Structure formats: C-alpha cells, structure tokens
C-alpha cells in the first residue's frame, strides 16, 4: 500500500519508461491498466473504528508543555526557506513527543530529561494513561472470551504491555524476535502459533514495522487496539489487515480502537493517516479503504520517522507553532 499517489510514479515509470508521468497524472494513467478486487466486493464485513481519548495527568501535561517548547526550539532552524523540510530532523523531534505521549517512561532514555525530578515523579504515578487504558481494556475483552491484538510503534512499549498482561498469556513480536520453527515458542512463528492455538494466550502485542505483513490472525482475533501510530500509512493499513481479511465469517464484527491522549500529537497523526487513506481510496477507486471514526468516551522507530512526508512536516510544524505558544 503506497502512502500517496507520488509513490506510484516510480512504479509506473518503470513499466512505461516512455510515458511522461507526474504526481498529478499518475492516477489517471494507472486506472486503465490495473485490476483490484475490493474488500467490499469480497463481502468482508466492515471494520468498526473507534477513538478512545484519555486525559493526561496534570504532571504529564506539564512535562508535555515543556517538551513542546523544546521541540519548537529544535525546529526553528528548519523553518528557513533553504531547509524547511529537513524531514529526518523533524521526524526525530516528533518521535520523541509521540514516545512520551504513549509512555512517559520512554522520556527517561533522553539524557536531557533523565535527571528531571518531574519525570521521576511521573513514573511513580503509573505507566501512563494510555498504557493503563490498553491493559484494562485487554482484560475486559479477555474476560469476554476474546483475543486481542495490541499495536505499538515502540519496542519498549511492546515488551512492557506483554509483561503487564503476562497473566493473560501475552506474547510479543518485534524486530528483535527471530524467525524460526513454529514449535519453538520463542520464535516469531512459534508465538503466532501459540496465539492461534492456545486458549490461555489471550493477547498478542506487536510492532507494525515487524509484524504488519504475512500474518493472518482473523480466524481467532477480531479486536485490535492501537496504543500509538506513526505517520506511516502503509504500516498502518497492513497492520489493520491482520484481523480484517478474506475468510472472516459474514457475521463477524471486527473492531479497532485507537487510544489517544487528549489535546496531543495523537490528533495530528490521526488526521494525516485519515487523509492518506482517503487519498489512496480515491486513487484505487476503493471505498472500503476508509477510516470512519466513532468516538468513545472515556532501529524500527527510525523507519517510522524516515517515513515522514513533506505534508506530514507541514502538519507537524503547524501543530507546534500555531495557537498558544505557552501551551
């Protein structure tokens, strides 16, 4: 799944080197030469998307404001006309903020904050509101007899959640888990098999960069929770397909929850991903590629910040530099 029509230009140019193709013409040029069967045509049940927004604690919000100010300072040099879209630098700044929102303890790895007393006090409070919610929700679903797939872009989150849910038989997969024989439960294949066959294994925690392709979980799991997401639309759509694919029974009700902190970078990521999915749906003439949100009250990471596009950068800069500069 490309992130934008621009990603299809090189593919089209390779197939038709004599054709003049640009970002704006590639969609019209590709329409007559591709065939794609949509999920709607296959009769796959519609996926239900829900957003759950949780508030930061007062202390986390205070540190978040400090972090935003620091990011604004770091981004100032890239706002000049000559270097406005130094995407990698912007991506690194954004990833630090996303890490903190998903799990405040990740900020303790940053030497600028390692000895901040506020960070220490925050870590004594909890694992953070998002992880607290995800673990609580996973327990609710497990109590209903459901298996749950939990996604996070950060390896430390993947392992931490699996540890917190070890009483539910939680397994985890990220880039550090080796491939191997499915009879060995320490391998990627072994963990997947256990999730499929062991009734005591109620939870699988995974990283989209390492586990978004080549795995079918829809036969045993129709519920996924995203602790966080990156700007990488390809990883997101592929990870979603682990539980939403051909073979689902017609009466299945697959559901996805996106967990966000209120008034945070999470909303910027969601808006950008929704736009990318909508753009690709129009390009591929596939209305099933949609993320209709209903609100609910209440070095793999390097690959993610390298996936930041110029439009993502614009959205990030607008978020950090618009509105109240004291926020």
Predicted features, each with a name:
Residues 4-7, 63, 157-161, 213-216, ...:
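Phosphate- and divalent-cation-binding pockets in alpha/beta enzyme and binding domains
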Residues 1-24, 229-235, 243-246:
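Signature of the SF2 helicase/ATPase Hel1-core->accessory helical subdomain module
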Residues 231-240, 244-326:
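A conserved SF2-helicase RecA2
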Residues 7-110, 141-144, 256, 265, ...:
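Inter-lobe coupling linker of SF2 helicases/translocases
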Residues 9-12, 31, 135, 162, ...:
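Amphipathic alpha-helical interaction motifs in eukaryotic regulatory proteins
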Residues 44-60, 84-216, 287-327:
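Conserved Helicase C-terminal RecA-like lobe
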Residues 171-268:
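Conserved RecA-like P-loop NTPase helicase motor core
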């Amino acid at each position: 799944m490309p992130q934008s029509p621009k990603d299809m230009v090189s593919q089209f140019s390779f197939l038709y080197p004599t054709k003049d193709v640009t970002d704006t013409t590639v969609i019209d040029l590709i329409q007559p030469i591709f065939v794609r069967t949509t999920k709607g045509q296959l009769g796959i049940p519609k996926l239900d998307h829900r957003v759950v927004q949780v508030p930061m604690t007062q202390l986390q919000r205070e540190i978040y404001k400090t972090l935003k100010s620091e990011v604004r300072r770091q981004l100032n040099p890239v706002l000049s006309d000559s270097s406005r879209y130094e995407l990698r630098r912007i991506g690194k700044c954004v990833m630090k903020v996303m890490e903190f929102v998903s799990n405040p303890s990740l900020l303790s790895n940053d030497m600028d904050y390692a000895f901040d007393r506020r960070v220490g006090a925050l870590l004594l409070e909890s694992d953070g509101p998002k992880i607290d919610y995800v673990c609580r929700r996973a327990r609710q679903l497990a109590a209903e007899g459901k298996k749950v797939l939990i996604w996070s872009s950060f390896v430390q989150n993947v392992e931490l959640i699996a540890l917190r849910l070890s009483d539910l038989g939680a397994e985890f997969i990220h880039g550090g888990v080796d491939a191997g024989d499915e009879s060995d439960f320490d391998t990627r294949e072994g963990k997947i098999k256990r999730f499929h066959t062991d009734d005591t294994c109620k939870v699988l925690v995974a990283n989209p960069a390492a586990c978004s392709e080549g795995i079918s979980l829809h036969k045993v799991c129709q519920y996924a929770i995203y602790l966080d997401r990156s700007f990488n639309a390809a990883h997101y759509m592929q990870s979603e397909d682990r539980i939403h694919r051909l073979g689902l029974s017609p009466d299945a009700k697959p559901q996805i929850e996106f967990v966000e902190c209120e008034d945070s970078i999470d909303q910027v990521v969601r808006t950008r991903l929704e736009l990318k999915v909508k753009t690709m749906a129009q390009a591929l003439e596939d209305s099933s590629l949609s993320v209709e949100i209903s609100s609910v009250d209440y070095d793999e990471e390097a690959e993610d910040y390298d996936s930041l596009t110029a439009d993502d950068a614009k959205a990030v800069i607008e978020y950090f530099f618009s509105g109240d500069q004291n926020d």
